[in-house]
Amino acid sequence: MAVVFEASTSPIVGREGDIVGARQLKERLMREKESNISMRIDETEDKSGVRVAGRGVLHLSVLIETMRREGFEFQVGRPQVVYKTDEHGNKLEPIEEATLDVPNDYSGKAIEVMGTAGGIMEDMASDETMTHLVFRIPSRGTMGLKTRILNVTHGEGVLFHHFREYGPYTGEMQGRKNGGMIAMSTDKAVAYALDTLQQRGRLFVKPGDECYEGMIVGESAKEGDMVVNVSKTKNLGNQRSSTADKAIQLTPPVTFTLEEALEYIEDDELVEVTPQSIRMRKRLLSATDRRKANKN
């Protein structure tokens, strides 16, 4: 797996980190290159960032976590697998072996999830309570897979996967089904706005959180991104509805670890990393810019 490190372009850059410059980021990663032989670290062709290749998302997350603790503030793109070509010019991708142990009642749902991730079942065995499954699966399909397995098995599934070989490229893979809730402006989230939005999907922020235009503040229940106003306040007037004075009750927001955030984002999204926060955002912050890019 490989990710590209870039200097942060967030509207609130510098508020939480002490080291934010592109030059300082590159110097730190080049020092890592000299001491860490398990990673391949090189500048991107356009010199806009540094590409770091490691053994997997967890391996890359360790470096990112170390740097944020050192005071760095930066952004990283979606992890990409490292492809190869054979002697005939055919595209090859890394293939892994995944073993899965799930309660019998959830085996069908687990097999379905593995199938949507590109997995091909090679072995299956079960006893009175548990089912043991073995799959051949592209490395691309393992991103976010653990979370999905835990969801469909109610936390009882155990997944382990490791690299097996390079094999023929298996084609395009379906991305995230649900769209994101994208903030329309830079402001703090307020409870009134979030109360309305939580009826349309899952929230990633709570009242008082700093948000900015292009930041992913939740997941829509439907396909396609939706631009939302997280700072909308109640219109004050003389007339009160019967529910006006009811206390707002918000469902706790979904929180992401660094590894989960990297696995969640799509190709047009980034993870913003600071010593205090992990945020997800669109690469193009402006809704107008995103519409233009989609047309092209």
Model-flagged regions — what are they?
Residues 1-296:
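Accessory interaction regions appended to the cores of large information-processing enzymes
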